[in-house]
Amino acid sequence: MTYFVFFLGICFVVGVLGVASNPSPYYGVVGLVLASVAGCGWLLSLGVSFVALVLFMVYFGGMLVVFVYSVALAAEPFPEA
């Protein structure tokens, strides 16, 4: 169980770094999804499954829709940083 929590922590940090290091939102979303899934998995491992489920549903139900809308408005897959 300790290795699983450590793995989720590493996935969360990698996801956050992936969001911070990508100038294009097309590729930053992969890190964002990885960080949210790892964070919800971390909450599940702590025993607060209802909170993890609610955060997962709210995030993927609302925040990802707003993100897709903003990506559609940006429409520049390879920006020059």
From Swiss-Prot:
Membrane topology (UniProt): Multi-pass membrane protein
Keywords: Electron transport, Membrane, Mitochondrion, NAD, Respiratory chain, Translocase, Transmembrane, Transmembrane helix, Transport, Ubiquinone
Molecular functions per Gene Ontology: NADH dehydrogenase (ubiquinone) activity
UniProt keyword NAD present: yes
Ranges annotated as spanning the membrane: 1-21, 27-47, 48-68
Reaction it catalyzes: a ubiquinone + NADH + 5 H(+)(in) = a ubiquinol + NAD(+) + 4 H(+)(out)
EC number: 7.1.1.2
One Gene Ontology CC term in the entry: mitochondrial membrane
Residues in the signal sequence: none
Chief localization: mitochondrion
Enzyme class: translocase
Subcellular location: Mitochondrion membrane
Coiled-coil stretches: none
Keyword Translocase: yes
Domain of life: Eukaryota
Family: Belongs to the complex I subunit 6 family.
Function in brief: Core subunit of the mitochondrial membrane respiratory chain NADH dehydrogenase (Complex I) that is believed to belong to the minimal assembly required for catalysis. Complex I functions in the transfer of electrons from NADH to the respiratory chain. The immediate electron acceptor for the enzyme is believed to be ubiquinone.
Protein known as: NADH-ubiquinone oxidoreductase chain 6
Species assigned in the record: Anas platyrhynchos (Mallard)
Upper lineage: Eukaryota, Metazoa, Chordata, Craniata, Vertebrata
